[in-house]
Amino acid sequence: MEVKSAKELKRVSKELQENFLNRWKLLNLEQDKDRLKALNEKSEDPDLWNNPEEARIVSQKKNELEKKLTPWFTIQQDILDFPDLVELTLDEKGENGIGELSMEYNRLQEKFEELELLGALKNSEDLKPAFLNIHPGAGGTESQDWAEMLLRMYIRYFEKKGYQYSLIDIQAGDGAGIKNVTLHVVGDFAFGFLKGENGIHRLVRISPFDANKRRHTSFVSVHVSPEIDDEIDIKIEEKDIRVDVYRSSGAGGQHVNTTDSAVRITHLPSGIVVACQNERSQIKNRDTAFKMLKARLYEMEQEKAKEELEKKSGEKKDIAWGSQIRSYVFHPYNLVKDHRTDHETGNVAAVMDGDIEPFILAYLKTL
């Protein structure tokens, strides 16, 4: 936006300041600031470290609050001081200062819009690392190949975003693609940014596996859940689970386990199945699998509570859990479209190379 007059600059600078203060109040950031101050004081108490578990929890909460507040602190003073800067610059330079002030306004407005998106990530889970699972639907090789294409898309996105990721479990497909894969993703607001990827991803293309070059439609389910803290109590009864151990079935190479160290846990009441094979130790694989199971069960409880609330308030969900969220059309035209936000692009190649941030941001704006 190009601001062309001194009068308009004064108006938009005060609007930006007011919007920032309103958002600060709405998100209770002053309370978070006080909590962070208290945690900083507590972490400096030498006696805290006599209790390693309490010290770990304090440190974790402190880090989470710092992640949440630092982006706001970074821009806070610039926005609050901007109306005064406008007055001083105009007094000193007159209309000659309008150009540089307009550029500064656009910079601050853009930063504030980014903060508003982060404001949509207000739940504590949004700050957490995430488990991302990709599972092909019916269709054999066709859908398994689509699952592998999505895996590459997400990995490219993580690399661009600066997220760290590790393959927890992967099962190779029959001849091509993958039957199932789970990744652990670590980074700022990892779950918050990825949670909108939950659902069915649909591909339309000319199949490379069809000798007659016919058009095929394939479906893959993506499921994202937050890594849960130990302080969140998720009870798992031994009688409710079945634990299987097996040999790693990765893509091969020197890191494939030659012992039965991979672990699969089935939660019998819910039917949830999780597996981990990336660690050398069966104990470590079991621990990671239990973390994944806790995450899935916690998420299931959260979803039930949300559905009950919507039921009581008379609201109806527009998009059902696990429904089709996005289509990727390679033929007869090029288009990727999100069915929840209507955000779309014809640059399919860029999307498949990890350029999915616009889709993620468009979804966050709806929250």
From Swiss-Prot:
PROSITE patterns recorded: RF_PROK_I
Pfam family, one: RF-1
Record's GO cellular component terms: cytoplasm
Protein name: Peptide chain release factor 2
Record gene name: prfB
GO MF, one example: translation release factor activity, codon specific
PTM comment: Methylated by PrmC. Methylation increases the termination efficiency of RF2.
Keywords associated with the record: Cytoplasm, Methylation, Protein biosynthesis
Record localization: Cytoplasm
Modified residues (N5-methylglutamine): 254
Function of the protein: Peptide chain release factor 2 directs the termination of translation in response to the peptide chain termination codons UGA and UAA.
Family label: Belongs to the prokaryotic/mitochondrial release factor family.
InterPro entries associated with the record: PCRF, Pep_chain_release_fac_I, Pep_chain_release_fac_I_sf, PrfB
Primary location class: cytoplasm
